[in-house]
Amino acid sequence: MGQLGVGRTGKTAVLDIELRRSGSRTIISRQYSEVPLQVQRALYPDAGLPGMAHVYVLSPSGGLLQGDRYKTSISLKDKAAAHVTTQGASRIYGMNSNCAIHKMDISAGKGCYLEYIPDQVIPYAKSRYFQEVRLAIDDDAAAVYSEVVTPGRVAMGESFLYDILCTSVRCENQDGSLRFAENARAEPRRMNLRGEAVLGGYSVHGTVYVMAPPESARTIEYTAGRIISHTDGILGGTSLLPGGAGITARLLSHRTDSIFKCIEGIAGACRMEMTGAAYPGIRKC
């Protein structure tokens, strides 16, 4: 497979956006991007939270190739409120050398509210993908961050045929104190990912992290547990994060839409608790 050299235009993508409150709305106050990552202007489709900015991360490339290096930075300040999602799934194409890497820095300052709910990752056969996420969430802010990973292009007969998929999430507060950290590595050619101690026969897995003050986190966890137990085709559970300043939810299913139904429900529980507004669902542009 031929490829451009690492660092060439189109191989190194950058997206850096800052959101602040301006009057009654959250606006994109700073924006810098290098193809293929880019964003549209902020939209305001939610009648329940008319000042919340909805931001859609776009990529005309269709997926990540070997040697791709992506860097995303999203920062919320001055009591900003934003819902950030992607235009579609992150497709990780097959590789015969090298790997694809995506590093993300996401921060929410005091009084801010963020929902970061991207579409699923689809690792193609022989792909290698590394994702590193650093969260900086103020103790007086609230944020939802989710990840969903599928087994591959199932319709093409590819299921758990990728080489390696590694994810790392680390969250700190405004003082740099660790809130939680987690690393995961999947190598289906070396591991039995369908085993009872891993995915238990399921094929799609999702994780949701909710960062919120302890008194709100307990309420959100209770509601999230009920949502999981009442969603068909889902095996999952919740737990409080260290120090009680948030929750994590683990989700397993055979269907991606069932996972996202749970994620939206949990995001809705957080939004209702923190803002008093209902969650209308993810709206794609």
Curated annotation (Swiss-Prot):
Keywords associated with the record: Chaperone, Cytoplasm, Nickel insertion
Keyword Cytoplasm: yes
Cellular-component GO terms for this entry: cytoplasm
Pfam family name, one: UreD
Main location: cytoplasm
GO molecular function, one term: nickel cation binding
Subcellular location: Cytoplasm
PANTHER family per record: UREASE ACCESSORY PROTEIN D
Subunit architecture: UreD, UreF and UreG form a complex that acts as a GTP-hydrolysis-dependent molecular chaperone, activating the urease apoprotein by helping to assemble the nickel containing metallocenter of UreC. The UreE protein probably delivers the nickel.
Family the entry assigns: Belongs to the UreD family.
Function: Required for maturation of urease via the functional incorporation of the urease nickel metallocenter.
Name used for this protein in its record: Urease accessory protein UreD
Organism: Cenarchaeum symbiosum (strain A)
Organism placement in taxonomy: Archaea, Nitrososphaerota, Candidatus Cenarchaeales, Candidatus Cenarchaeaceae, Candidatus Cenarchaeum
